[in-house]
Each structure stands twice: as structure tokens, then as C-alpha cells.
Amino acid sequence: MQHYETVEAVTFAYGQRHHLEIQITREIAKEQGIRHHILDMSLLGQITAQPDFATIHISYIPDKLCVESKSLKLYLFSYRNHGDFHENCINTIGKDLVNLLDPRYLEVWGKFTPRGGISIDPYYNYGKQGTKYEGLAEQRLFQHDLYPEKIDNR
């Protein structure tokens, strides 16, 4: 550190469970004579700190099995108190339905309420391998959301 005019340390306070991390970093910086900055990142929030609202669009072409709408609603309601990223939720819903139904084609699109002006609308699709639906899935993925909605027209 003697090769530099000034050395400064930065710690990001992002709501970590162990505040001891920040305390130890502060003490080490003080011992070394290093200026220490703590940047509060709590504005990012934790995964489960804020409720998320979404409209989930599910379209599928069945093969031999269909899902009853009441069962599907109960399954989707199980996500009410589930803390996870939007993308993970949509991917899990899609994979669960593929495993359950073995459909020819399936797509799941989550339209989540924007936070801070940023909209995250994850999309999952599946086409049964070796069928024309495999090509349909690829085509739909490439054409998906070419003209996304604006935040003010939801």
C-alpha cells in the first residue's frame, strides 16, 4: 500500500444477515489507516421484502393429458408467499407443467408489475423434441416480445 498516495476501502451494505462483516471490515481499515466508505444499498430491497404482482399467461397444446383449471389455480396460488426471482418462478412453473403434462407445446409468460420503472416479464416455452412443435418453440422464442408494452399501457 505504500506505493499509492491514497488507499480507500468500500463496503456495500446490502442487508446481509451478518452485520459483523461490515464491523470487521471497518476495524481492519482503521488499523491499516485506510479511509473506509460504507455504501447503503438497502434501496435494492431483499427478495421477499416487497410483494410482487403478476399476470401469468399459460398456453399449451396438450398431448394426452390436460390440467384442470382449479388444480392449476391452486398450484399458482402456492407462489403467493414464495420468495424468488421472477425468472426462476416462471421457469419452475414451465418445467413443472412439462413434467406433469408432457405437452406438445407449452409457453408461460409472467407479466410482473414494474418496480422503479423497470419491467421484468420472463418467458418460458417448450416444444416436444422431434416434432414440429420443437421448431414452433424456437420460432416463438425468437419472435417473443418484439414489440414490448410500455410501462404506462398495462
Curated annotation (Swiss-Prot):
Its main location: cytoplasm. It holds the Pfam family QueC. Gene3D superfamilies: 3.30.1130.10. GO terms for molecular function: preQ1 synthase activity. Pathway: tRNA modification; tRNA-queuosine biosynthesis. GO terms for biological process: queuosine biosynthetic process; tRNA modification. Keywords: Cytoplasm, NADP, Oxidoreductase, Queuosine biosynthesis. Substrate binds at residues 67-69, 86-87. One of its GO terms (cellular component) is cytoplasm. It catalyses: 7-aminomethyl-7-carbaguanine + 2 NADP(+) = 7-cyano-7-deazaguanine + 2 NADPH + 3 H(+). The keyword Repeat does not apply. Its EC number is 1.7.1.13. The active site is at 52 (proton donor). InterPro entries: GTP-CH-I_C/QueF, NADPH_dep_7-cyano-7-deazaG_red, QueC, QueF, QueF_type1. The keyword Coiled coil does not apply. It is found in: Cytoplasm. Catalyzes the NADPH-dependent reduction of 7-cyano-7-deazaguanine (preQ0) to 7-aminomethyl-7-deazaguanine (preQ1). Belongs to the GTP cyclohydrolase I family. QueF type 1 subfamily. This is Putative NADPH-dependent 7-cyano-7-deazaguanine reductase. The gene is queF.
